[in-house]
From Swiss-Prot:
Its cofactor is [4Fe-4S] cluster. The gene is acsC. One of its GO terms (molecular function) is methyltransferase activity. It comes from the Bacteria. Coiled coil: none annotated. PROSITE patterns: 4FE4S. Heterohexamer composed of 2 subunits of AcsC, 2 subunits of AcsD and 2 subunits of AcsE. PANTHER family: ACETYL-COA DECARBONYLASE_SYNTHASE COMPLEX SUBUNIT GAMMA, PTHR36214. This is Corrinoid/iron-sulfur protein large subunit. The keyword Iron-sulfur applies.
Length: 446
């Protein structure tokens, strides 16, 4: 929890000098607590007090950056246990694992397939964020070659997975500027791993065999001066991993246990790709900031990415599209006009069905604060007056010759009033988007 004004006041010099712009230190403390002032405004605060206040004000889970440049991914910096309390902020990063045991041709083909993992769904663009290269070969040079090959073939972020710091060091030399995640520091190698991560300013995964060992290892690494950490509590069985992830998140959020105040990495282990995706869905749901999978099939990953997108939307703000007149196909002055709300799911469902009719059409989206048709109508946000006003706003009269507009069947009651307000012919369309194709064939086919 954030500090109160009185708790902050105890750390201040209590000089009441007024140089911060407020007459007393207590008033300044109250402003700090409410976010209206910065500690930098006080010239007399001690270094110890500043460190204590900065630590208290720090987010319960640190922000860790994977990668560099425009593709860099922010992990952590979360404040809630439950999405409905506020929201989750940084989407789980998805990484696809490749092995240095693959031949150069196999590796090239694998990376090419991973680069193609891009999806567009209901107006949202989905993609993965990283490729994880695992050192499985007996020859350390194979790992260096694999890392170099992957780095040259992709702009995705990198995760370098090797237990031997010397092997990692050789491979990292050519890609250090891309700030890959180094996996992983253990009780046996943490000093060398930490030195390598510090030297190259890279995030470091910390692997512990259980929560107690993990906490002790994190404290040792932080004492060595590196705080860009990602946690792996070691569990690979799904229910055990979920239990550990939940404990880490709960202790970080509720108890401010700093040893667990870092993002979590999860590795899937299921042999069957569908089971692997189910594992990943559970890990995304239960607090993993980075999930590493082996499957790279689009049909396996799309459900996972769709779930991630839904989980990380703001539950207090409906997903919506812009209020405007949208063109579907090569429209002309004879094209039919449909109208719907700007709720994203409704809009893209209608748009997809209109595209399936193969009839170039206009689709007018009306701003209903992101509510669906019936919900917006019940709330008074999708009424004849509102539709008429938007029609005038987009100058619809001059867009088409035949003044007729198709409204959703669920709000057929709007037909008469909308005709009176606009002078247009109002056609009552189907109640569901799935009926648009049959409706168009029956009513719009020339």
């Amino acid at each position: 929890m954030p500090l109160t004004g009185l708790e902050i006041y105890k750390q201040l010099p209590k000089k009441n000098c007024g140089e911060c712009g407020t007459p007393t230190c207590l008033a300044f403390a109250m402003n700090l607590a409410s976010g209206k002032a910065s500690l930098d405004s006080c010239p007399y605060v001690s270094d110890a007090a500043r460190e204590a206040l900065d630590a208290a004000a720090a987010p319960p889970i640190a922000k860790v950056v994977l990668g560099a440049g425009p593709t860099a991914v922010e992990m952590g910096d979360e404040t809630e246990l439950f999405r409905h309390d506020k929201r989750f902020y940084h989407e789980t990063a998805i990484a696809i694992q490749v092995s240095d045991n693959l031949s150069s041709e196999e590796l090239k083909a694998k990376v090419e397939a991973i680069n193609g993992l891009n999806f567009d769904r209901v107006g949202q663009h989905y993609t993965i964020q990283a490729i994880a290269i695992r050192h499985d070969a007996d020859d350390p040079a194979a790992f260096k070659a694999a890392v170099a090959s992957v780095a040259a073939a992709t702009q995705l972020n990198l995760v370098l997975m090797a237990d031997d710091p010397d092997v990692l060091k050789e491979a990292l030399a050519g890609v250090a500027d891309r700030k890959p995640l180094l996996y992983a520091a253990t009780g046996a190698n943490y000093e060398a791993m930490t030195a390598l991560a510090k030297e190259n300013n890279c995030p470091l995964a910390v692997y512990g065999n259980g929560l107690e060992e993990l906490a002790e290892l994190v404290d040792k690494i932080v004492a060595l001066g590196h705080k860009q950490l990602v946690l792996d509590p070691g569990a690979r069985e799904t229910s055990r991993a979920i239990a550990d992830f939940t404990q880490i998140r709960r202790l970080a959020i509720k108890k401010r246990f700093r040893s667990f105040g870092y993002p979590i990495i999860a590795l899937t282990t299921a042999a069957n790709p569908l089971d692997e995706v189910l594992q990943a869905v559970n890990y995304v749901t239960k607090y993993a900031s980075l999930v590493v999978l082996r499957t790279d099939a689009k049909e396996h990953l799309l459900p996972l990415l769709s779930w991630r997108q839904n989980l990380y939307t703001d539950p207090q703000v409906p997903i919506r599209v812009e209020e405007k007149l949208n063109e579907i196909g090569a429209v002309n002055e004879n094209s039919p006009v449909y109208v719907t709300t700007n709720f994203s799911l409704t809009y893209y469902s209608v748009e997809g069905e209109i595209e399936s009719t193969k009839i170039p059409s206009y689709l007018l989206s009306v701003d209903t604060d992101g509510l669906s048709v019936l919900t917006a109508y019940a709330d008074g946000k999708f009424e004849a007056e509102k539709i008429a006003a938007v029609m005038k706003k987009v100058d619809l009269d001059n867009k088409v010759k035949r003044h007729r507009i198709i409204i959703p069947g669920a709000v057929a009651v709007l037909k008469g009033k909308l005709e009176d307000l606009t002078g247009w012919e109002v056609i009552v369309g189907p109640r569901e988007a799935s009926g648009i194709v049959a409706f168009a064939r029956a009513n719009l086919a020339s």
